[in-house]
Amino acid sequence: MVTPRSAVPAARPLAARRLASVAWACAALLALVALQCATATKDIVTMHATRNSLIPKDTLTVAVVMIDSYDNRLVFHANKNLLFGASNTSARALAEAYNLLGEVYVTYAYYRWARDDRPVAVGRPAPDYVLGTRLLSGPGSQKIKPPEERPSFPLSGSLRGKSLLMPRKVIFNDPLQTLMPFVFTRYLSITLSGYWDISVNSGKNVFSLCVSSPATPPVEVIATPRSAKLRESRFPQWPRYLYVSSSETSVLVNVAAGTSYKPRLYNATLAGVKAFLEVQNYGSHVAAGQLLTIKQLLKHGCNREPDEPFVVAAALHFGAAWHRFAALAAETYVTDAEILEFVVTTETWAKQVELCFSANAPQLGAAPPASRLAILSGRGGADEGLINVPYAILQVSRERYWGEVRSVNEQLTILTAILGSVDRLGAAAYLPSADGVAPHAFAASIIDSYYHKLIRGSATDKIDRKTLSAAVRVFLARKADSIPTARRVLTHMTVLCSEHQAQNPLVDITGTIDAASGHGEIFCLDDLFTPCAAALRFDLEPQANRPSGNVISASAVYRTLYGSFLYGGSELETAALLDDSARVIAAAQPVGGPKAYADMFFPELARCFDWTRENSIVFYIAISDSASWILTTRPVTGGVRYRLPDTSIRTNLYLTYFNASCSKEPFASRVEKITSGYVNLHGASIACKLCGHALLRYSLGGFEDVFVIRTADEERQMTMGANSSIQYFRAMDPTYFNYILMDSSGSALRVLAFTHGSYAVDKNYIIGIAVGSLAGVFAVAFAARSIYKFYRGRANRYTLLTNDYD
């Protein structure tokens, strides 16, 4: 149990802080020159300020560097008269008055807020089993490769050690001047710039994090060993900063003083500091930060009101994950595959937070805000090799024949390398492999493979979900050259977005995260992927009360944070597990929509559909290379339109066919009546008469799902009923569901039953056949009677004639 000395930030007047920042920056630059000539053996060395009696009274000495027994005096003199004005002038008096008022305000704020201080309990740190195991076992007989050596394939055997990070001595120049400058061994430096500016320094036993934005006060966290005697910049009469410590580490927290006390900010910061001290595994920090992000989304959506407590807590997990990962790499080893997964996951996570939780979050259909993530920028000496690992792996993987890659792990590695390189390389990340297979084709083949497995009810595990998710992201990250392939891929995802796929254990959000956290594994949003996340289905609403309403319990989060689209919704059970039973994504703002996909891959819809009624779209799919079917809740113009019968009075569904001609004839303005008929399921059709047809299923409550028949095997499976290997056909129940059969020419047939008569028989056709047959019977009878009478008449006439001659 540790009691913080004070839970209040220290602040200086704005002008004084700016001047001090300039002074410390200059001192740090000059001190770096001295460090090049000094050799230090300690991890942390303090830098003391001094005053020389020979220096004029109005001159301020900033710093003198002392490293071990070497007394390298580096003096920087600043003239107070130049900085604050000459003595006995109004400018100097005003500056001193501002400074005095600042001291009085901060002292009063400390006194007022310190009454709310509570003990901070820091538990015993949980051991990092990965680090412990590697310290005991070591890399074994495998050689640790230096950064300049190319990684091998598969990546499990390519190990890297301390040379990856290139640790070196640098001066820590505190942006908020919480501590006087000191020297430490830095492993890496991370800078995130955008609406939120976040800087992280990680070194041997030293960690620092600073978070700031235009609308919030800066927050700083500095962790150092308890044995380090570091000087603080506070005035002696001030209480200390927020101070939390464990058995080996002390943490200073500095929040710039604002106009009001923010308990949520302090609570979030304390929780993040406790997690930093208690959790030693980098994967656990990534999992905890992702869970925090998901909770924030489920509660508030992608709001444009900056939530500093959440961002500070997420940033602490982000920085702690990198700090622990750097320690693992420096003290033992990490594999190229681990570097690849960690770098891509944390980069994606940082972009998602910037995209969804900043004041400049994009409006509907707008481009994402500009942001930049720099890892190991090289300032002060950190190697660039870490962020180049994804590209190095991509280069190695291109030498393989992607068309022959069947291992799920290798597929995931290649896809992740592409995702980790696309921001830096752009179109160069989409160059083909040695056998000419481009990333779009590679991703599409993986999606096709999983589609054929999933429609047959095959279960998926974590690696399968991550691979399918990565394939979809690679395919959609840049516009595909082949529009027919893109239409097929999106139709696959729409077919898979059904109630049956919702039974996949993948929707267990908390179970997935807890399993990852408990084993020290990295959790990312790819672990929550469902086909609905990339489906052309837009009826996923929080108010939906139907059997298929739970298909979005995981995909809604994925849709939002991966920049696709979101129309909200989740199971109340899942929301309760996530401590949010009141609001479930209801406030979420979509960052894309049906029109975005139509503009890219469905030109007939982009040109012909009335986009003023975009909100009425339930789903759309491609039925051919140039035609589509779209289901809406309101009638639309521009195509052949049908109203679905037998829905509730509160649910109106309209099915419309669009092709390149954009029908504007008068018939297109009226609603066509869907004829009813029977579909034969007897035997398999060698010609595959149903290929290119779609079967839509709906009930009294609304749309359920859709299936597109593409192959003769799928048509044969349709005939097998409960024995079919395809889940959609096994669940067919015409007594409860209604089915609409749609073809590629714009015709729609309501299926009354599946019989063994003819391929597709309309009831009017049956009546016509019956009437025609009956008429034929009468005609035959009449003809027979006429012939009989004719011949009998001729026979009688012949007899009479014979009698006459006789």
From Swiss-Prot:
Q: Which family does it belong to?
A: Belongs to the herpesviridae glycoprotein H family.
Q: Which InterPro entries match?
A: Herpes_gH (IPR003493), Herpes_glycoH_C (IPR035305), Herpes_glycoH_C_sf (IPR038172)
Spell out the protein name for this chain.
Answer: Envelope glycoprotein H
Residues modified by carbohydrate are 88, 267, 659, 723
For this UniProt entry, what is the primary localization, expressed as one broad class? virion
Where is it localised? Virion membrane; Host cell membrane; Host endosome membrane
One Pfam family this chain carries? Herpes_glycoH_C
Q: Where is the signal peptide?
A: 1-40
Membrane-protein topology: Single-pass type I membrane protein
Q: What does the subunit section of this Swiss-Prot or TrEMBL entry state?
A: Interacts with glycoprotein L (gL); this interaction is necessary for the correct processing and cell surface expression of gH. The heterodimer gH/gL seems to interact with gB trimers during fusion.
Keywords per UniProt = Fusion of virus membrane with host cell membrane, Fusion of virus membrane with host membrane, Glycoprotein, Host cell membrane, Host endosome, Host membrane, Membrane, Sialic acid, Signal, Transmembrane, Transmembrane helix, Viral envelope protein, Viral penetration into host cytoplasm, Virion, Virus entry into host cell
Record's superkingdom?
Answer: Viruses
Role: The heterodimer glycoprotein H-glycoprotein L is required for the fusion of viral and plasma membranes leading to virus entry into the host cell. Following initial binding to host receptor, membrane fusion is mediated by the fusion machinery composed of gB and the heterodimer gH/gL. May also be involved in the fusion between the virion envelope and the outer nuclear membrane during virion morphogenesis.
The GO cellular component terms are: host cell endosome membrane; host cell plasma membrane; membrane; viral envelope; virion membrane
Ranges annotated as spanning the membrane: 765-785
UniProt's post-translational modification comment states: N-glycosylated, O-glycosylated, and sialylated.
Q: Which residues lie on this side of the membrane: Intravirion?
A: 786-806
**Positions on the Virion surface side per record topology:** 41-764
Entry annotated with the keyword DNA repair: no
Query: What biological-process terms (Gene Ontology) are attached?
Result: fusion of virus membrane with host plasma membrane; symbiont entry into host cell
